């Protein structure tokens, strides 16, 4: 297959209709997938989406589920010495360390040029189990293929899903996804805040299992946006944690996987019976209403909801925690945010997904750090109005009261002192308290009932 044959044009604003089977087909005969208007994507994206929804008879006891996600955002708008996405890479290999939630016997990887301005030439890519740092577990390194080829050109705005390969992946494994970029990429697709050290090496080091060539450490993920596994039949779908920096795990311990979705993954992996995978669709600084000038904060929640939630393999339910940045950064009112929540609820339900509304966590005392209406009386009034609506409207399939889980009973506008990372963000203990507030039994029961 030629490169030209692997590139297709997406008609602006035209949704993609996919045939469904299984749980999602009970809700609709077709599903509209939200794609970036006017973009080009590698055509491997389309058939593999179909693969994610329709299982063959030989695969009847297994289902593809998303096991890791790093929602992609543009580079080039915010210089950081820890993440060279502003200038990109040139004849370098990036080794991304990703922490999966569920295991399986086959794996596939999503590479992303979603925010690229020019086509992205990938010379080669590989996956392996990580043994720590940039080193891999001996004997586990596998090359990735795209339509049978080791290289692929991904159009600007596009993504490419690798061919599935047999590989034993265990729940809670760390995997090394290495991508070689033979030419200059320009400003690069990234996930800016990784809470994970990743690595760069000169030249093509995708086949190297040692850490030696990877002499540079970076703080972001680059060019990889997802990993799926073919899980056994006790993994009944994917739970998507969708949100901003609090979901992204800002101020959690680096390299320790202590974000609240990681804590959910730990609980789900420990279950003896039916369970779920969980992926993190949080983006630091993300908002419901506004694309911020710093594009590493991502596009608005409605803009990216299809890509980061609906289109995830095995998607069954979403936890939505968004809005605090709209209040703090934009002085948004509850009346501004509620229609957006309703839009996302409708999108989830049309796709056959459950969606759970999470109350906004306390931010008292954060104004000195973040300015705006973060922690002001006006901002607090809007937070309370939003939370009252989430709790009482009945619009969501359920409510997760993160506010109650982490607030200080003696001063409920602020985080409990033991949970403070800063006045806006929880620490590891606070993220664990958030995870403890999620009724996983109820979510799993709701998914299985469909």
Where are the language model's segments positioned?
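Oxyanion-hole/transition-state-stabilizing segment in secreted/luminal serine hydrolases
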Residues: 248, 252, 283-338
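Catalytic His-Asp segment of secreted/periplasmic serine-dependent ester chemistry enzymes
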Residues: 287, 294, 298, 328, ...
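Surface-exposed amphipathic alpha-helices with a cationic face
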Residues: 341-349
């Amino acid at each position: 297959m030629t490169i030209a044959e692997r590139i297709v044009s997406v008609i602006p604003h035209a949704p993609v209709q996919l045939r469904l089977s299984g749980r999602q087909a009970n809700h609709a005969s077709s599903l509209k997938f939200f794609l970036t208007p006017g973009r080009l994507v590698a055509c491997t994206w389309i058939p593999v989406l179909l693969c994610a929804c329709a299982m063959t008879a030989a695969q009847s006891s297994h289902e593809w589920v998303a096991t890791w996600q790093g929602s992609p955002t543009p580079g080039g708008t915010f210089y950081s010495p820890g993440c060279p996405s502003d200038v990109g890479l040139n004849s370098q290999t990036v080794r991304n360390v990703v922490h999966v939630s569920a295991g399986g016997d086959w794996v596939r990887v999503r590479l992303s040029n979603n925010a690229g301005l020019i086509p992205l030439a990938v010379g080669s890519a590989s996956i392996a189990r990580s043994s720590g740092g940039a080193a891999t577990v001996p004997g586990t390194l596998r090359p990735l293929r795209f339509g049978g080829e080791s290289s692929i050109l991904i159009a600007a705005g596009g993504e490419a899903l690798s061919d599935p390969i047999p590989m034993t992946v265990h729940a809670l494994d760390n995997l090394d996804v290495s991508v070689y970029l033979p030419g200059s990429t320009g400003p690069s697709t990234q996930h800016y805040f990784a809470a994970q050290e990743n690595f760069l090496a000169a030249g093509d080091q995708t086949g190297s299992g040692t850490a030696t060539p990877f002499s540079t450490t970076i703080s972001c993920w680059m060019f990889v946006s997802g990993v799926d596994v073919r899980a056994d039949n006790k993994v009944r779908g994917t739970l998507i944690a969708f949100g901003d920096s609090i979901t992204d795990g800002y101020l959690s311990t680096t390299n320790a996987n202590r974000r609240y979705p990681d804590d959910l993954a730990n609980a789900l992996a420990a279950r003896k019976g039916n369970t779920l995978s969980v992926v993190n669709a949080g983006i630091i600084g993300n908002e419901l209403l506004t694309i911020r000038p710093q594009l590493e904060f991502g596009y608005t929640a409605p803009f990216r909801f299809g890509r980061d939630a609906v289109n995830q393999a095995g998607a069954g339910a979403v936890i939505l925690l968004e809005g605090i940045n709209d209040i703090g950064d934009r002085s948004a009112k509850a009346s501004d945010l509620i229609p957006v929540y309703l839009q996302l609820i409708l999108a989830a339900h049309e796709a056959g997904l459950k969606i759970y509304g999470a109350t906004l966590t306390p931010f008292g005392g954060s104004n000195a750090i973040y300015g705006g209406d973060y922690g002001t009386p006006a901002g607090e009034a809007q937070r309370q109005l939003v939370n009252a609506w989430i709790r009482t409207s009945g619009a969501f399939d359920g409510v997760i009261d993160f506010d109650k889980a982490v607030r200080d009973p003696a001063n409920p506008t602020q985080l409990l002192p033991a949970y403070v990372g800063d006045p806006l963000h929880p620490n590891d203990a606070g993220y664990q308290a958030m995870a403890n507030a999620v009724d996983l039994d109820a979510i799993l029961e709701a998914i299985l009932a469909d």
